[in-house]
Amino acid sequence: MANKIIAENQPGNKVWVANLSIVFALLSVLALVSLHFLSPEFTPSWRMVSEYANGKFEWVLFIFFSCWGISSWYTAYLLWSYVRSKAGKAGVILLFISGTGEILAAFFNVNHPQHGTAGTLGIPTFVIASLLISYHLKTRDGWQENKTILLWSAHATWISVVLIIITMVMMITGFQNAGIIIGPGQKPPAVLPDGVVALVGYANRILIVVYMFWLLFVSNNYRKIFKAEPGLVRL
């Protein structure tokens, strides 16, 4: 009897987890948007989001990365007991690792030697996690009608990573042709030289939007499934 009560109460608690995931994701987005107004000196077309740490509002960037990581953690917790396949479980673990990378990025800013480690933990793991989890969720009741959005949003993660790589190579090549050295420990030029095609900043922001959309979509769809048919999300 006690086990039955626990099982019946657990889904409601997980909906609160979904709500928290959504709240922290939205707070992260709000922090990022506000940085564009608080620190307009960082041109969004070619300055990476992490460079806001060199401005006067590093604490807002800290909120951005922290809330992003917490949202990923909450989503991982939400899905851990919900997914059933080994691939899905592996995806949830990778999502938790990705959230850890995002949290570390809050503490290890762009000037810290471990900032690259944070990015390695946070970015590629999210791509694999979203694909593994999404391909499992599309087989579950309540997800079929939205599987197109689910899968497209998952595939958009790796597309956004490829976009960053391409635009980064284009920008670095342009800087080299202009005689400007760009690399670790080198400060970026104050003004973009003529002839340099620099869109990596936009690509960076597209990646963030794509990652956030997936988190929001998964958490919100979980909520909708529970409201429509609570039994579908019970263990």
Regions found by a protein language model. Name each.
Residues 10-13, 78-90, 138-152, 224-230:
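Membrane-interface helix-boundary motifs at transmembrane edges
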Residues 51-70:
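Interfacial helix-start motif at the membrane-water boundary
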Residues 1-14:
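Short, Lys/Arg-rich, polar N-terminal cytosolic tail immediately upstream
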